[in-house]
From Swiss-Prot:
Topology versus the membrane: Multi-pass membrane protein
Lineage: Eukaryota, Fungi, Dikarya, Ascomycota, Taphrinomycotina
Gene3D superfamilies listed in its UniProt record: Hydantoin permease
Transmembrane residue ranges: 69-89, 95-115, 125-145, 150-170, 195-215, 219-239, 259-279, 299-319, 391-411, 419-439, 468-488, 501-521
Region named Disordered: 566-590
The entry's keywords: Cytoplasm, Membrane, Nucleus, Transmembrane, Transmembrane helix
Name listed for the protein in its UniProt record: Uncharacterized permease C29B12.14c
Family of this protein: Belongs to the purine-cytosine permease (2.A.39) family.
Subcellular localization: Cytoplasm; Nucleus; Membrane
């Protein structure tokens, strides 16, 4: 099954006078915004499916183990990860204790992420489609909506951070750039900062255009450029400070009780950092060449890559105190200080190189964690009108409209709110993992995930699995008081203490609750033993998509409306020379 490369093509009509009437213009507009559907798809099914939601065809399963190594190695280098260990040091831990907590945290995160993405690698389906098996055909819209909202918010935040990288790049070339007149004072930002943000936003829009299975090349490029930039930053800071500074020699002064909770908070912060990636990991594992391709790259590369990045962050932050008298954990703030204190061409060249690497790092993180997720999620919310590409651009527009500089101006409350929101995502993750691994034992009826039929196993109660929502509420209730405290309300101290492990409480509680509820009220379509071989469900379902018409590649008039159709050809072969099933020839759509 082979998709052709996407192209931008406008429907070609022979214009008549009627096309310029209100009725004609409305008809043409509707034809443009409606996503093409497989011939024979009913109107009801069009609210469940489009080409981006179907299982990935064989020709697009091109992510091998080394692609996942490059992906996670590239993703590990970003501004947020850089500062995690520094935050733990600020809480009172020694540098090596902070680093160990990071290794432990990301090892746990890698394990949870790997099992959460298993269904995507086996059945080649995305998170929104997988959610239908647990929450029901219509019930899945709730976790999808939650994930989509988070993706849009985080897109704007990460884009603003990427814009700061662009600003540093421009400042290193034209030092006077930061002194241009501020015409945006009332908006809460500086003109030069907004220009950097807008440039990064435009660059991101170019990356959004490409289909997901092709953007692996972006992460490969990032894996070769971003880590060397981080290492160069480390060497530069150590040389400039004549060592790593005093922070690495400091010992913890915390009591045993506070020391234990500081370690715990450091571990959980890593899980919070991965909350979104854990849930939407099937969006990437679905492109795996084999079900096992992502396993070891994720289990090994994530703790190693993220651990090394945080180590660099701690050493650079410690060195900054010897240079400027204070620990500067944010790498962008330290680069700004370099430019503020020196106009030497060597300093400017170094800042430009490092800022370019960090800019590429932020671009990759934003595409992986937010754009792809928002595209998949919004596509599932309204598949008749939105595909992954359009969904990505929707997130991009929301990201700039939400004025992320205003959110970050009150950084503490905003960061606490986003961290608290990880509780919602942890409950979703616990249910998805319990449902797939324990209850269904790895078996999914793929065709039923795309069907509105009361007789199918994922219809449950009018399309909603009440068991999953009961489990979801259990996962929230155990954290609801601590959640209120995290956003500023007065709550008992015990609740605040529990909030330090909110993610683990949420995922474990929802996991166990779902097992118990489904034991009392069993679901159908479950395996008798765990599926330990590659199922034929996905490929068999793809074969059923073959139309009775062998080739449909042009616009045809249906009741006077031009309708775009998709052609199917079962004779194409995949890249490895084996039969690739159906060939969907996409005359693609924006």
């Amino acid at each position: 099954m082979k998709f052709s490369k996407p192209k931008f093509s406008m429907p070609k009509w022979r214009l008549t006078k009627e096309d310029f009437t209100p009725k004609g213009m409305w008809r043409n507009f509707k034809n443009f915004i409606v996503i093409e559907a497989k011939p024979g798809t009913t109107l009801a099914e069009r609210f469940l499916t489009n080409e981006d939601l179907y299982p990935v065809p064989k020709s697009q399963r091109v992510w091998g183990p080394w692609n996942y190594v490059a992906f996670w190695l590239a993703d590990s280098v970003n501004v947020n990860t850089w500062m995690i260990a520094g935050t733990a040091v600020e809480s009172g831990l020694s540098w090596w204790e902070a680093w160990i907590t990071v290794w432990v945290g990301y090892t746990i995160a890698a394990f949870i992420l790997t099992i959460a993405g298993r269904a995507g690698a086996v059945y080649h389906i995305s998170f929104p489609v997988l959610s239908r098996s647990s929450f029901g055909i219509w019930g899945s819209l709730w976790p999808i909506l939650n994930r989509a909202v988070m993706a849009c918010v985080w897109y704007g935040v990460q884009a603003w951070i990427g814009g700061e990288c662009v600003t540093l790049m421009i400042r290193s070339i034209w030092p006077s750039f930061s002194h241009i007149p501020n015409t945006m004072a009332k908006s809460g930002t500086e003109t030069y900062q907004w220009v950097g943000f807008f440039i990064f936003w435009l660059i991101s829009n170019v990356a959004i255009w490409f289909p997901v299975y092709q953007i692996r090349h972006l992460f490969t490029a990032k894996s070769f450029l971003a880590p060397p930039a981080a290492i160069a930053f480390l060497i530069w800071a150590l040389v400039k400070a004549h060592g790593a500074g005093d922070a690495i020699h400091a010992k913890t002064q915390l009591s045993t009780w506070n020391h234990g909770w500081a370690v715990t908070a450091g571990i959980i912060s890593c899980l919070d950092n991965f909350a979104t990636l854990i849930v939407n990991n099937p969006d990437f594992t679905r492109f795996a060449t084999t079900p096992n391709a992502p396993i070891f790259p994720q289990l090994i590369t994530i703790p190693m890559g993220f651990g090394i990045t945080t180590l660099i962050g701690v050493l650079v932050g410690s060195a900054s105190k010897s240079i400027y008298g204070e620990n500067i954990w944010n790498p962008l703030d330290l680069l700004k200080s370099f430019l503020d204190h020196s106009n030497h061409h060597g300093v400017r060249a170094g800042v430009f190189f490092i800022s370019t690497g960090l800019c590429l790092a932020q671009l990759g993180v934003n595409i992986a964690a937010n754009t792809v997720s928002a595209g998949n999620d919004t596509s599932a919310l309204c598949p008749m009108f939105i595909n992954i590409r359009r969904g990505g651009y929707i997130a991009s527009i929301i990201g700039i409209c939400m004025c992320p500089w205003n959110l970050l101006s009150s950084s503490n409350s905003f960061a606490n709110s986003l961290s608290a929101y990880a509780v919602f995502l942890s409950s979703f993750a616990g249910i998805l993992i319990a449902d797939y691994f324990v209850i269904r034992k790895g078996y999914l009826k793929v065709d039923a995930l795309y069907t509105i039929n009361p007789n199918e196993p994922y219809w449950f109660t009018y399309g909603i699995n009440l068991r999953a929502f009961a489990s979801y509420i259990c996962g929230l209730l155990i954290n609801v008081v601590g959640l209120a405290g995290a956003v500023g309300d007065k709550v008992p101290k015990a609740a605040l203490t529990m909030n330090n492990i909110a993610y683990l409480l949420g995922i474990v509680t929802s996991f166990l609750s779902h097992l118990i509820i489904c034991k009392i009220f069993p679901v159908t379509a479950c395996g008798e033993k765990f599926l330990d071989e590659r199922p034929e469900e996905t490929d068999n379902y793809l074969l059923t998509l073959e139309s009775t018409e062998d080739t449909i590649s042009s616009y045809e008039e249906t009741e006077g409306i031009p309708v775009k159709k998709v052609s199917y050809d079962s004779k194409e072969k995949s890249d490895d020379g084996k039969s690739g099933g159906i060939d969907i020839k996409e005359s693609s759509v924006f």
